[in-house]
């Protein structure tokens, strides 16, 4: 499977810039998700790689082939880029059986009957849809139609499989099942997958790397846990995670050492020990980012607040804690319920607390209430 490289790729419509100077490399056999809010440029990026949209400028390389170069006037057609595309709408032929839907494209590619039969059986077995061979799309469930669409896309052995929000039409239970199937399929096929979604849960669970985009600009391009634990900026920290990260304004009180400072946090003193050298002053616009799991509720905790709301979800419970005029989120394992305004004691733990200077991440570190 090929390596894909985008070099200074930009797409404009008039004065509107959909994708701004994007540089990224998709390595062989990676599962990449293009993630971001609606209108951020993720689908435009996918379409430019596929050749369905022409960039305003830049260069795109698939394998050893330059498929687009604005300076050289190169723009290879989608049909010659050897990619498979799976859309939100599965676009199955309603008058064709499952077998015919899968083989129709291979017939147009002039494959031999023997090769068509062998490949169709291979992908149907891979997707576990052999029993539906003679059924029509209307006789299948949404998940079964999804599998047929994937089988049809994989049948010609494309170098890369592109997917544009393919699970968005499914219910929550089926989406969960199909995430499992897609991840296993990626392993079984040894293919390169590029997947567009606005659902951060899909991105976190499926991807080997996440490309998070906002307003056409790449904000971070890293493995899911790196994006979660080491967000580049406030946008990334806020977009990834459910419940979202807690953000609390802080002021510098004292510089203890190059990697250690005392901060004023909700009217309390907080010792922050960073993993790298800090470069902050009294004028710095500081914000602490704390994931809900780093605020455990414990008797005798260093901080005290009151229960604003309790949101039990069976396996885990989200507790909204009011402390002064700030509402914080804490997540605990199991089912628990607090009365409104009940006193809650909690701590700050862990070494994944992020200190932001303005809109830039300064360092990851641990914090201790003094």
What do the PLM-derived regions correspond to, one by one?
Residues 5, 25, 61, 345-347:
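ABC ATPase nucleotide-binding domain
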Residues 11, 21-26:
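Conserved A-loop
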Residues 35-37:
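The feature captures the beta-strand-to-loop junction immediately N-terminal to the Walker
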Residues 50:
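Helix-to-loop junction immediately C-terminal to a conserved catalytic motif
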Residues 58-70:
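Conserved ABC transporter NBD signature motif
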Residues 81-84, 88, 92-235, 239:
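ABC ATPase nucleotide-binding domains
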Residues 243-248, 252-370:
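Non-catalytic connector elements of ABC transporters
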